[in-house]
A protein has these predicted regions:
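Short glycine/serine- and small hydrophobic-enriched flexible loop segments
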Residues: 71-75, 142-152, 228-235, 300, ...
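Alpha-helical positions within canonical tetratricopeptide repeat
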Residues: 81, 169, 242-245, 249, ...
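Long, repeat-rich segments with strong aromatic
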Residues: 252-257, 302-313, 319, 323-327, ...
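Catalytic cores of carbohydrate-active enzymes
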Residues: 23-45, 61-62, 99-105, 178-191, ...
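Alpha-helical support elements that line or immediately flank enzyme active sites
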Residues: 65-96, 294-306, 362-374, 381-384
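Bacterial Sec-dependent signal peptides at the C-terminal "C-region" and cleavage site
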Residues: 1, 12-25
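Helix-terminus loop motifs that line ligand-binding clefts
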Residues: 77-159, 164-191, 324-344, 380-412
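Solvent-exposed loop and edge beta-strand segments that line ligand/cofactor-binding
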Residues: 49-67, 74-76, 122-135, 208-224, ...
């Protein structure tokens, strides 16, 4: 009889213990018990161990891509090879101080590009740059900042490449942006008109080089990336003689983003300011478009309040519902009209014109966790996790109906998901019942 009482008492106490868990503890336990998260993280790390190129179908090493898997690469790749891959970017920095998009061995330079980049100190490689964008310099600064955070290798800042240290070269990249891509009227960086963070412009068959067909445009993505880059410079070299300038630039860019690009009434960023002519066809309201990727980077840059983050996230979810796309990786909504871009992007919900990219959706998940919105982050990452398992790979982007497209093992997608999973599980470990 006493044994029965003891057992019943134990069960009752256990029941009270389980039901006494807080919502936070239940969520933490659910995250920690989700084997799909562990599976996808393992898959991501295996993908990134295969090299520093952007993914299957890409022979090139891109700065904007490496920026999103560098932290995982620091844990999974050969440290010397990773360091050398980073330094090679600086070897290919151009005489005008601009940074390239990426590089490849000369024998693998097999595509059409009428403006290849070369350097005497990197004789085996050829570089390339989609000049419609203005994120290359910022992306490489992010890479170095993240690399130092993960490895503690501050010596890379003093590494001399072609007569200048890495830190000096990064400061020269800031000089280049302020000299060549800074609009004085608005106090912001500009590039050519593209779809949010994209690197393809309309009105041009090739679409990747700034030229006479380009429409200069100011957007939140380029400027948020620059704000983050300046934060990294201040973190890496707080005692530099350039630190006061970096701090002043950071404050000015952040203020001007809020002044000129934030639409207070609609609680969203406007897509573009056009200092010259607008390419938008009559009758189409570009101001109604929500740029999901640029917004995620703006959150990372600290440009939105917690209340605003909740608002834009709710809007992203509504845009996903209205569009019928799979996840908040949806690049933008509403999409640009049929035929506005050329080639494949001329159709809505294709590639950067409304395709669904884990590469940016995963970064939004990261920011939700960082800003304490873990329940939302976990719910919103699930469609991305499920499609990796279903399709056995990290596809570059997804079209209508969740159809996988582009590179089948896109390392940017793998990197952002792995980091998001680590953030979720770290939070869960601290809050479990």
């Amino acid at each position: 009889m006493n044994k029965i009482l003891v057992i019943v008492s134990f069960v009752f106490i256990s029941f009270l213990s389980c039901t006494g868990l807080t919502d936070r503890q239940r969520l933490a336990n659910q995250i920690l018990s989700d084997t799909n998260l562990l599976k996808v993280d393992s898959m991501a790390r295996a993908t990134i161990r295969s090299g520093f190129n952007a993914g299957s179908g890409y022979s090139q090493i891109w700065a904007r891509d490496m920026n999103t898997f560098i932290e995982v690469a620091c844990e999974e790749s050969d440290p010397h090879e990773l360091r050398e891959a980073i330094l090679l970017f600086f070897a290919l920095q151009q005489p005008n101080d601009e940074m390239i998009d990426g590089y490849v061995l000369k024998e693998d330079f097999t595509w059409y590009d009428d403006t290849p980049y070369y350097s005497d100190v990197a004789p085996k490689h050829v570089a390339f740059k989609n000049t419609v964008e203005t994120d290359q310099e910022s992306s490489l600064i992010h890479i170095v900042g993240k690399y130092i955070r993960k490895t503690g290798d501050r010596g890379i800042l003093d590494e001399v490449v072609a007569g200048k240290t890495v830190l000096e070269r990064m400061n020269l990249m800031v000089d280049y942006l302020m000299r060549e891509r800074y609009n004085k009227e608005y106090g912001l960086l500009y590039g050519a008109m593209t779809a949010d963070w994209g690197d393809v412009q309309p009105n041009d068959d090739f679409g990747c080089d700034m030229n006479d067909l380009s429409d200069p445009a100011i957007d939140v993505y380029d400027n948020a990336m620059f704000v983050i880059a300046l934060d990294y410079l201040l973190e890496m070299a707080p005692d530099s003689s350039q630190a006061p300038r970096w701090r002043s630039l950071r404050e000015g860019i952040a203020k001007n983003v809020r002044t000129h690009l934030w639409d207070e009434k609609r609680q969203k960023f406007i897509p573009h300011i056009y200092p010259e002519e607008s390419p938008i066809p009559e009758g189409f309201d570009e101001l109604a478009i929500h740029y999901h990727g640029g917004t995620a980077i703006a959150i990372e840059a600290g440009l939105l309040s917690k209340a605003e983050i909740r608002t834009v996230n709710a809007r992203m979810l509504e845009n996903v519902r209205l569009s019928g796309m799979p996840s908040i990786g949806l690049t933008l909504y509403p999409v640009y009209p049929d035929g506005f871009f050329r080639g494949g992007m001329s159709k809505p919900y294709v590639y950067q014109n409304g395709g669904d990219w884990t590469w940016f959706g995963g970064r939004m998940i990261q920011q939700l966790v960082v800003n304490g919105m873990v329940e939302e982050a976990y719910a919103e990452i699930c469609p991305m996790i499920e499609r990796v398992i279903k399709n056995d790979g990290f596809y570059e982007w997804y079209g209508k109906g969740g159809i996988p497209s582009g590179s089948g093992n896109f390392k940017g997608s793998a990197g952002v998901l792995s980091k998001a999973i680590v953030l979720l599980r770290d939070w869960a470990e601290k809050n479990k019942g």
